[in-house]
Amino acid sequence: MLRVLHTIEDVREQTREWRAAGSSIGCVMTMGALHEGHLSLVDAARRECDKVVLTLFVNPIQFGPSEDFDRYPRTEEADFRALRDRECDAVFAPATETIFPLGERRIDQVRTKVVVRGLTDVLCGPRRPGHFDGVTTEVLKMLHIVDCDRTYWGEKDYQQYAVIRAMVEDQGLPVKVVPCPTMRDVDGLALSSRNTYLDSGQRAIAPRLYAALRRGARRIAEQGIDVIGETTKQIAETLLAHGFDLVEYVEVYTGSLGPAVAGTPVEELRVFGAVRLGGARLLDNAAVADEVGG
């Protein structure tokens, strides 16, 4: 039976009870508007942990002033129904004031914030100033509240996963950060709550992002690191030709977000892309290792 919890005290009471019974705890953190990608994380936690908690919180401090906080989809009752079907044990759905009692609504208003340097200086970091600081500040707080053993993150938002993994390691937290494969629609589009922003014409274009990134990853797998510059340029040109409004970046990094330098094994590389299409900002990535020998 799904327990719906709204206060920090209720969550801590529940996790203490589970701990006393010797249960392990897995946590999936979301902003709601759940889809099969989120639910696959619940399934992964269910397989590996005795108890599963999902957090459902649209975190205001990870949004910039001109971003989509106000229109981000909120489907709480549908989310609860989906979690009951997946046999999730508890959902923590706090009010904004519960997590930020001082009235913080932007990262620059937060008294104590968590900054992961280096990993947030590439890819989405420069394009969304303060975004990752807002993510890590809220996630660290949730980890302290939920007291889980394992936390599960999708590889679609790979930079977010890498940043959270680094934060947990740097803080010495006794939590394992578990990456999970990106869930995709039948045409290859990565599942995302923001896909609802796309109209039918844009939805037909959107899968071409992953297709282009995969082709680039395959070329790097076949021809090596020396073709990265030419390959990323060609991907960006292809995406614009296919109808995307803006290509924010197409870049290649290692799985730990290090640079692709001479001597780096191609199997360690990923091709990352971010584009704008209508009112949606779409992210995806392709692992070169998946294309080796393909």
UniProtKB/Swiss-Prot annotation:
Keywords: ATP-binding, Cytoplasm, Ligase, Nucleotide-binding, Pantothenate biosynthesis
Active site, UniProt feature: 38 (proton donor)
Binding, (R)-pantoate: 62, 160
Biological pathway: Cofactor biosynthesis; (R)-pantothenate biosynthesis; (R)-pantothenate from (R)-pantoate and beta-alanine: step 1/1
GO molecular function terms noted in the UniProt entry: ATP binding; pantoate-beta-alanine ligase activity
Single GO biological process annotation from the record: pantothenate biosynthetic process
Predominant location: cytoplasm
E.C. numbers: 6.3.2.1
Keyword Nucleotide-binding set for record: yes
A single cellular component GO annotation: cytosol
Family to which the UniProt record says this protein belongs: Belongs to the pantothenate synthetase family.
Subunit structure: Homodimer.
Function per UniProt: Catalyzes the condensation of pantoate with beta-alanine in an ATP-dependent reaction via a pantoyl-adenylate intermediate.
Protein name: Pantothenate synthetase 3
